[in-house]
Amino acid sequence: PETDVPAGDIGVGGREVGFMFGMYKKLSHEFTGTFTGKGREFGGSLIRPEATGYGNIYFLLEMLKTKGTDLKGKTCLISGSGNVAQYTAEKVLEMGGKVLTMSDSDGYIYDPAGIDREKLDYIMELKNLYRGRIREYAEQYPGVKYVEGARPWGEKADIALPSATQNEINGDDAKKLIANGVMAVS
């Protein structure tokens, strides 16, 4: 009960946790597990970055199973473009789904052709390496719509996957999702 275990969160990833862990080691001369979210080179978990996004999809698959279906061929709206959204999208693709949207705090992209593995790699590089904005995706790929200052919940799809921050879907958003045929939100 008296133990504090610092961890990554919005804007704090493995790099930042690694900095804190390095300073802890320097000051305490210990290499014990006092931080969660550190890189593997510091004793972190194998798939820590993927865990939340993958877990979201595993939960979704269980929900879909109760309806006698799975993700194959289903269209998905994803909000966010950070760690959780990236790995949510990756697992959707692995399970045969089609990702139509991703977003950031400025707006969202809608790609009717779908965000495939190559396009997702572009987003991961854009966001993780260059700290770019999602609108740059629309500038890179023809036929993509960028909607400034909005969330993707007004688009038609089978599934909605809020993966940005908390309190993403309000009552009006829920009505839009239902009206547009969304069968599951995870």
In which residue ranges do the predicted regions lie?
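Glycine- and other small-residue-rich loops at beta-strand/loop junctions that grip anionic moieties
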Residues: D9, S45, P49, L77, ...
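ADP-ribose/adenylate-binding Rossmann-like module
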Residues: A157-S186
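Conserved helix-loop functional segments at active or binding sites
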Residues: K26, L61-T66, Q166, K175
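N-terminal ligand-binding/catalytic initiation module
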Residues: P1-L46
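Short acidic (Asp/Glu) and glycine-rich catalytic loops that position anionic groups and cofactors
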Residues: P1, T36, S103, I178-A179
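Structural motif
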Residues: T3-V5, T32, T75-C76, G97-T101, ...
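Mobile, glycine- and charge-enriched loop segments
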Residues: G149-R151, K156-I159
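Glycine-rich phosphate/diphosphate-binding loop of Rossmann-like nucleotide-binding domains
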Residues: G39, G43-R151
